[in-house]
């Protein structure tokens, strides 16, 4: 009867994934419990919501607290297993006929209390076996939590690096075509400059593409090393107390060294190549713009939406108290118009044109078709440029000083210029602009 009860008790404390005692146990929504490391590895590639490994029921929540009750019960079960192991004749001290309850850190041996105080071992560090094992197991779990965060961070970077490499070629092809179209509007004498501009663009494309490829390979290799280390730590945690203490070695130091030199994503950036006469030509259509300023609590989610798009996460809470929006007093519906705005003192900004209907909406979304905007967002220490309709990244250096906006209703296009560099940032394809618009400016300090 006692044997049946003991077997049933052990079964309830066993993870169905690894078939060992639960380590850092968590109980998910359906009521089943697993080792946190086992669940992390099981759900690593799963889409949200993930399914329970036991009953396959969807689990909308993926972040759980440690089940303290189960953890304490597992500690009791481990203690019982340890005492069963120590009760064998082999674990009785031949000299003092006492149970070997102490562990010597120096020679990794089990000692009775009297031997641990002897002249031979007196200078060594020794601890009660169960206390030492639990202490080291907790250190391993702490290291695993750190390691898992790095695994996830590296996985996100790996995905983003692959995505950037995929977008990179298409981005450069579009930029080359845009540059050709712009030179067609200028004097034929600039043909040599156009050729040099495109050659420089192609050279930068090749160099940065190789950087992206090398970076992706490094991240992929680091991902394998991190997971191998995580698996090794997990296997160590699952070992019985005595085996854990004897086999521990330098595993913690090795796991710390794996965390060093984490590969960082490449921030690809093309040089803003000048186009002779670009700003001079557009200045013929220059207009003065006056703005109606709007209070900061207007429900505009431009930067939050773009950050969500960039990092493929849910809406991010962002303090908008330092942002303000402004709309042009004048509506444009025909002709050609050019103006400039100063963005030198802003970290995050958006400028361009929008439809009146977009302004009136309660929640202005960045993926709306009623706006043609150039956005600049600071993420960590890097500035990202994007345009809307659709949301599209531009891997080109951030403009300093003034940005030019050119409306051309004859071709149905909107263009953005780096005025300081006399460079074209982006020009929408002909036929994109088909409705009346007014200037828009949104800026802030972060």
Curated annotation (Swiss-Prot):
Give the UniProt record's GO annotations in the biological process aspect: innate immune response; regulation of gene expression
Chief place of localization: cytoplasm
Q: Which family does it belong to?
A: Belongs to the TRIM/RBCC family.
Start-end of B box-type zinc fingers = 88-129
Which InterPro entries does this UniProt record tie to the protein? B30.2/SPRY (IPR001870), B30.2/SPRY_sf (IPR043136), Butyrophylin_SPRY (IPR003879), ConA-like_dom_sf (IPR013320), SPRY_dom (IPR003877), TRIM/RBCC (IPR050143), Znf_B-box (IPR000315), Znf_RING (IPR001841)
Mention any Pfam family matching this sequence.
zf-C3HC4_4
Top-level lineage group: Eukaryota
Q: Does the keyword rRNA-binding apply?
A: no
Q: Where is the B30.2/SPRY domain?
A: 269-446
Q: Under the GO molecular function aspect, what terms does this record hold?
A: ubiquitin protein ligase activity; zinc ion binding
Q: Where are the zinc fingers (RING-type)?
A: 15-56
Which PROSITE patterns does the entry link to?
Answer: B302_SPRY, ZF_BBOX, ZF_RING_1, ZF_RING_2
A Gene Ontology cellular component where this protein is annotated is: cytoplasm
| SMART domains attached to this UniProt entry | BBOX, RING, SPRY
Q: Which UniProt keywords apply?
A: Coiled coil, Cytoplasm, Cytoskeleton, Metal-binding, Zinc, Zinc-finger
Q: Where in the cell is it found?
A: Cytoplasm, Cytoskeleton, Microtubule organizing center, Centrosome
Report what the protein is called.
Tripartite motif-containing protein 43
Induction or repression:
By DUX4 during herpesvirus infection.
UniProt xrefs under PANTHER family = E3 UBIQUITIN-PROTEIN LIGASE TRIM
The record's function comment reads: E3 ligase that regulates nuclear lamina integrity and the association of viral chromatin with transcriptionally-active host chromatin. Acts thereby as a herpesvirus-specific antiviral factor and mediates the ubiquitination-dependent proteasomal degradation of PCNT.
Residue positions annotated to bind Zn(2+) are 93, 96, 115, 121
Coiled coil stretches, renumbered: 129-158, 190-220
Transmembrane region positions? none
């Amino acid at each position: 009867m006692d044997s049946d009860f003991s077997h049933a008790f052990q079964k309830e404390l066993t993870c169905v994934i690894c078939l060992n005692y639960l380590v850092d146990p968590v109980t998910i929504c359906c009521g089943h419990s697993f080792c946190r490391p086992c669940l992390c590895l099981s759900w690593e590639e799963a889409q949200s919501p993930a399914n329970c490994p036991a009953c396959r029921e969807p689990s909308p929540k993926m972040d759980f607290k440690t089940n303290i009750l189960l953890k304490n019960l597992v500690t009791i079960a481990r203690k019982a297993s340890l005492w069963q192991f120590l009760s064998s004749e082999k674990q009785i001290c031949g000299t003092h006929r006492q149970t070997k309850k102490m562990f010597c850190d120096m020679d990794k041996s089990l000692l009775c209390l009297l031997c641990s105080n002897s002249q031979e071992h007196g200078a060594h560090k020794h601890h009660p076996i169960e206390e030492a094992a639990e202490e080291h197991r907790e250190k391993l779990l702490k290291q695993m939590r750190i390691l898992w965060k790095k695994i996830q961070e590296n996985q996100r970077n790996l995905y983003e690096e692959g995505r950037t490499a995929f977008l990179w070629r298409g981005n450069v092809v579009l930029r080359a075509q845009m540059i050709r179209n712009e030179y067609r509007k200028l004097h034929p004498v600039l043909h040599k400059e156009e050729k040099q501009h495109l050659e420089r663009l192609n050279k930068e494309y090749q160099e940065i593409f190789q950087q992206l490829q090398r970076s992706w390979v490094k991240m992929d290799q680091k991902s394998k090393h991190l997971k191998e280390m995580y698996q090794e730590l997990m296997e160590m945690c699952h070992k019985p107390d005595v085996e854990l203490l004897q086999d521990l070695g330098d595993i913690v130091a090795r796991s710390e060294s794996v965390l060093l030199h984490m590969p960082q994503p490449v921030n690809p950036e093309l040089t803003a190549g000048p186009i002779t006469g670009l700003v001079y030509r557009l200045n013929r259509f220059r207009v003065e713009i006056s703005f109606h300023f709007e209070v900061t609590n207007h429900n505009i989610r431009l930067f939050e939406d773009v950050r969500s798009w960039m990092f493929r996460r849910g809406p991010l809470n962002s303090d908008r108290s330092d942002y303000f929006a402004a709309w042009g007093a004048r509506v444009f519906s025909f002709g050609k118009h050019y103006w400039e705005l100063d963005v030198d003192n802003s970290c995050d900004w958006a400028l361009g044109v929008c439809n009146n209907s977009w302004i009136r909406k309660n929640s202005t979304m960045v993926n709306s078709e009623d706006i043609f905007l150039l956005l600049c967002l600071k993420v960590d220490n890097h500035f990202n440029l994007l345009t809307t309709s659709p949301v599209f990244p531009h891997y080109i250096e951030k403009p300093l000083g003034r940005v030019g906006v050119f409306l051309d209703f004859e071709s149905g296009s909107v263009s953005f210029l780096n005025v300081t560099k006399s460079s074209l940032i982006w020009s929408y394809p002909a036929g994109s602009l088909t409705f009346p618009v007014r200037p828009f400016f949104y800026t802030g300090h972060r």
